[in-house]
Design a protein with these regions (language model features):
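Signal peptide processing junction and immediate N-terminal pro/mature segment
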Residues: 21-30
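Short helix-initiation/N-cap motifs at beta->coil->alpha
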Residues: 79-90, 176-188, 225-227
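A ligand-binding cleft/hinge motif common to bilobed small-molecule-binding domains
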Residues: 101-114, 191-219
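Bacterial N-terminal signal peptides
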Residues: 9-22
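Periplasmic-binding protein-like
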Residues: 36-50, 124-134, 213-253, 259-286
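Acidic, polar ligand-binding/catalytic clefts
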Residues: 82, 87-145, 156-158
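Bilobed "Venus flytrap"/periplasmic-binding protein-like clamshell domains
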Residues: 46-70, 105, 128-188, 192, ...
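Extracytoplasmic small-molecule ligand-binding "clamshell" domains
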Residues: 31-108
Length: 286
C-alpha cells in the first residue's frame, strides 16, 4: 500500500489551497480562518504511522475534494489530514464532518464513538497499514522473538495489534516492547541491535533494501492482508449526502481526481457492504 510520500492515500490527494476556485476545498489554514460556503461537505483523513509529508498529503486531499465537490454537485467540500486520533477528535467535535478516510486501526478505534459506517476501501501505494510483519536479524521464527525486545511504531493501539493484526498469533505483552516514533527508526532498531525483532508494516518492509544493513533483516511472520484505506460515513452525515457520495465513490480517481490520486498513490476506490468488516469490528470491540 514507489515510494511516493503519500501519507495518505489514505490519504488521498494536488492543487494547493492557494488555487481553490469558488466551488472548492479549503486548505488547512483556511479551514480555521475562513467560513465555508453554506452546504460545504466535511471530510477528515486519519492516517496513523504513515511516512512522508503531512503537508503534501493535505494538498492532495484538497485537490481530491475539489474534484469530488464538482462531480457530486456540492457547493464545496473541505477536509483535514491527521496522523493522531487525539488531534482528529477535537476537529470532529468542532466541525462534525460527514465522511472520512481512515487507516484500518483508526477506523476500528473511532467507529463506535462516531457512528462510522464503512462505505468503501481503496488501495494505497507505500502508505502502509495493508499488512504487518515481524522482522529480525537473528531470529527465524515468531516464537524465537517472544520474550525478546520488539521495536514498533505501531503499538499505540495495543488492542488493534493483539486482536486484529496478530490474528491470535501473539500479544504485545509476549515481548519486551521498545516503542519507536518513526517508521525508519523501527527498522534501524533491529539493524543496529537495539531490538531483537520489530513489528512493521508493508511500507516499512518495502524500504529494507534502501537502508544500510537492511539486507540482513528478514521477516519471520506476516499478517493477513488488510484494507489500506477505509472510506466511511459518520453517523451524523445527512442521508442525502451519503447517497450522493456512494454514487461517486468509485469515480473518485477519475477525471479531475486522477492527478490527486496519482500523486497520493491512491488507487481502486470501491464500495463495500456496511458489514464488510463485522468480524474485525466485533473482535476489536470485544
Amino acid at each position: 500500500m514507489t515510494a511516493r510520500p503519500s501519507s495518505l492515500a489514505i490519504a488521498l490527494s494536488c492543487a494547493a489551497a492557494l488555487l481553490v476556485p469558488p466551488v472548492a476545498v479549503a486548505g488547512a489554514a483556511q479551514l480555521e480562518e475562513v467560513a465555508q460556503p453554506a452546504g460545504t461537505v466535511g471530510f477528515i483523513v486519519v492516517r496513523e504511522n504513515g511516512s512522508g509529508s503531512a503537508s503534501a498529503a493535505q494538498s492532495y486531499l484538497d485537490a481530491l475534494l475539489t474534484s469530488l465537490a464538482k462531480r457530486a454537485g456540492w457547493p464545496a467540500a473541505s477536509g483535514k489530514y491527521f496522523t493522531k486520533r487525539s488531534k482528529a477528535k477535537k476537529f470532529i467535535e468542532e466541525t462534525k464532518p460527514s465522511f472520512g478516510f481512515f487507516s484500518f486501526g483508526a477506523y476500528l478505534g473511532m467507529r463506535k464513538a462516531n457512528g462510522l459506517t464503512a462505505m468503501g476501501v481503496a488501495d494505497a501505494n507505500a502508505t502502509g497499514g495493508a499488512q504487518y510483519f515481524v522482522i529480525s536479524k537473528s531470529a527465524f521464527t515468531l516464537d524465537a522473538c517472544k520474550g525478546k525486545t520488539l521495536a514498533s511504531n505501531h503499538a499505540d493501539d495495543a488492542r488493534f495489534v493483539d486482536v486484529v493484526v496478530s490474528g491470535d498469533a501473539f500479544d504485545l505483552a509476549d515481548f519486551e516492547l521498545v516503542e519507536t516514533k518513526r517508521p525508519v527508526q523501527t527498522v534501524k532498531a533491529v539493524i543496529n541491535g537495539e531490538a531483537e525483532c520489530a513489528l512493521i508494516d508493508d511500507a516499512q518492509i518495502s524500504t529494507l533494501a534502501t537502508i544500510d544493513g537492511g539486507a540482513a533483516v528478514h521477516p519471520v511472520w506476516a499478517s493477513e492482508a488488510m484494507p489500506a484505506v477505509i472510506i466511511a460515513s459518520f453517523g451524523s452525515a445527512p442521508a442525502e449526502q451519503v447517497d450522493t457520495f456512494a454514487k461517486h465513490l468509485e469515480a473518485l480517481c477519475e477525471g479531475d481526481g486522477k492527478g490527486a490520486c496519482d500523486a497520493a498513490g491512491l488507487t481502486a476506490p470501491r464500495k463495500v457492504e456496511a458489514d464488510a468488516f463485522a468480524a474485525q469490528q466485533a473482535a476489536y470491540d470485544g
